[in-house]
Amino acid sequence: MWLYTFAVALIVIAQEINGEPHTRPSSATPLNATLPPQEEGSAQNTTDAAVGSRLSTILRDLPTIKNISIFICVLTTLLITCLVIKICRSARKIRKTRKYDIITTPAERVEMAPLNEENDEEDDSTLFDVKYR
């Protein structure tokens, strides 16, 4: 939801940078309207004008579209960079996993002990809770 709000705010800001928001002229004729035979040539001109007005609208808004596209590309690049940095940092932190074995003693006491005792340089204070069912 915050992304949608951010996108709307960005569009509003971009419109304010380029000036007042422009309203598009309605060049469409009603669907049930009939043209007299002498106006058939002007119907072709109306269609050309409608296409021309759409293109002029796109061309008028081209700087805004360009600014939004550049912003989205920069944001995507930043996100990808952050993910790559996070992956590189986590790859450095991966340590050799210690494997544990179950040692059973009388009176149902169970404890965990490392299998390889030669790597006891670290003070390992991991506690294991065993629950009996």
Curated annotation (Swiss-Prot):
Superkingdom, natural source: Eukaryota
Extracellular side: 20-67
Cross-referenced InterPro entries: FAM174-like
Membrane topology, from the record: Single-pass type I membrane protein
Chain spans, region Disordered: 22-47, 113-133
Keyword Transmembrane attached: yes
One Pfam family linked to the record: DUF1180
One example of a Gene Ontology biological process annotation: Golgi organization
Ranges annotated as biased composition (Acidic residues): 117-126
Name by which UniProt lists this protein: Membrane protein FAM174B
Gene source species: Danio rerio (Zebrafish)
